[in-house]
Amino acid sequence: MALWGGRFSLAADRRFKQFNDSLRFDYRLAEQDIIGSVAWSRALVTVGVLTVQEQQQLVQALTALLEEVRTDPRSILDSDAEDIHSWVEQQLIGRVGDLGKKLHTGRSRNDQVATDLKLWCKDQGEMLRQALIALQQVLTACARQNQDAVMPGYTHLQRAQPITFAHWCMAYVEMLARDESRLDDALRRLNTSPLGSGALAGTAYPIDRDRLADWLGFSAATRNSLDSVSDRDHVLELLSAAAIGMVHLSRFAEDLIFFNSGEAGFIELSERVTSGSSLMPQKKNPDALELIRGKCGRVQGALSGMLMTLKGLPLAYNKDMQEDKEGLFDALDTWLDCLQMATLALDGLAVKRPRCAEAAQQGYANATELADYLVAKGIPFREAHHIVGEAVVAALAQGKPLEALPLEMLQSFSPVIGADIYPLLALDSCLVKRSARGGVAPQQVAQAIDDAQRRLGNIL
C-alpha cells in the first residue's frame, strides 16, 4: 500500500509504478532510514505523540529490523514497496500493528530522505577517507623504499629532467592529501540534520531539532526548512570531490601503465593485478590500472548529470531529486573501489632500477644543468639556453650524451665551459642541486616522506 493513497480513486498504472518506484536503488538507505526513525520516535515522546512504552516497543521492532537489514540488505528487494521509507513502515506495521502508523507523525518523506542521504554520505565518506589515507601510506612506504631509484621525469611525454621514483610517489601523496581535504570539507558542510523540516515549511510539533540532530550524530540542525528539503549541494560537493579524486587516480594509473610498458620498462606489476590474453600467451596486461583509468569517465558523468538535474528546479522538493541517488551511489562506490585497487596495484610492484637509470641518462635530461652552469659563469639565461640547444644538436649528430662530448667541442659553443662541467652533468649531481623545498634532492624527498608519515600517523 502506498503512503499517499487516500487522495486517489484509481490504482497507479503498472508501468508508472515501475517508473516511479525507487526501492531498487534506495534500499541502500535502509540502515539510515531505521536509525533516523529511532531518533524520530524519541522526538515524538518529547511532544507527547508517543508514550515511553510505545516508543520502546517501536525501538525494539526497529532494532530487530536493523539487524535483519545488516545481515541481508538485498532481501528488501523482494518487496513491491515504493521506496525504502514505505518498506520500513510496512515492516514496522507488520510487527507492531497500528502503533507503527504513528511513527510518521510530523515527518515528511522530504525531510526523511534528506536525512537518510546525509547519514549515508557520512558513512560512505568515512570509508573513502580511510581508503585515501591507506593509499597515501602505501605510496609513502613505496617512496621510502625507492629513494635512490633515479628515473626520467617527463614533460610532453618526453624526457625532461631526472627525478626519483620516490619523488614521483610523493607527488601523488600530495594530490591525495588534497582529495582527502576536499572530502573532509564536504563532509563538514553536510553535517547538519534536515529532520524536522517537514515537507518544506517545518514540522507543526515543537520538537527540539538541535537535540534531534545530536541524537543522529550531526553537529547541528539545518537553519531553514525550505532549504533543507530543496537542495542537494552536498551531493554535488561529494561528486565533485570524487570527480577530482578520480582524475588523480586516472593519471596515476596512466603513469604506471606507461612505466610498465615494454617501451619504458621501469616497473613490473604483480601478477595479482594483471591478466593475460586469450590469443597471445606472452601478454601480461595492466587491467587493474586500465579499469581505474576507464572508470574515471563514469564519475565525471555522474557529476555532470546531477548538475543538470538540479539547475532548473524550483523550490522546494521535486521528484527530479529522486535522481540524486543512483549517480551518487555509483560514483562513490567507484571512487572507493578504485582507491582500494590502486593500493593493491602498488603491493608487489617492483622498480627496475638499472633500466630507470639508463633511461634517465638518455634524452639529454641533464641539459638544464649545463644551462645553469653557464648562468653561474655570468651568461644570461636566454643566451645560455640557446648555447645548450646548439650543444644538444651536436651531441645528437654524434650519437653521444652531453657528458661524452670532448671539452674542446663544448668550448666551441662557449669558452667559459671548463672541465669542472663534467661532474655537474652526472645524474646524482642533477638531483642534489634541486635542494629547494619540494625539490628532487635526496634530503628534500626524505623530508617529504618523514612529514607525510608523521601527518598520516596523526590523522588515523
UniProtKB/Swiss-Prot annotation:
Acetylation as UniProt keyword: no
Pfam annotation, one family: Lyase_1
Any one of the GO BP annotations: arginine biosynthetic process via ornithine
Enzyme type, top EC level: lyase
CDD domains registered for this protein in UniProt: Argininosuccinate_lyase (cd01359)
Reactions listed under catalytic activity: 2-(N(omega)-L-arginino)succinate = fumarate + L-arginine
EC number: 4.3.2.1
Locations listed in the record: Cytoplasm
Keyword Amino-acid biosynthesis belongs to the record: yes
Pathway(s) served: Amino-acid biosynthesis; L-arginine biosynthesis; L-arginine from L-ornithine and carbamoyl phosphate: step 3/3
Matches recorded under Gene3D superfamilies: Fumarase/aspartase (C-terminal domain), Fumarase/aspartase (Central domain), Fumarase/aspartase (N-terminal domain)
Gene Ontology MF, one: argininosuccinate lyase activity
Gene Ontology cellular-component terms listed: cytosol
PROSITE patterns, alphabetized: FUMARATE_LYASES
Organism domain of life: Bacteria
Protein family per UniProt: Belongs to the lyase 1 family. Argininosuccinate lyase subfamily.
Protein's recorded name: Argininosuccinate lyase
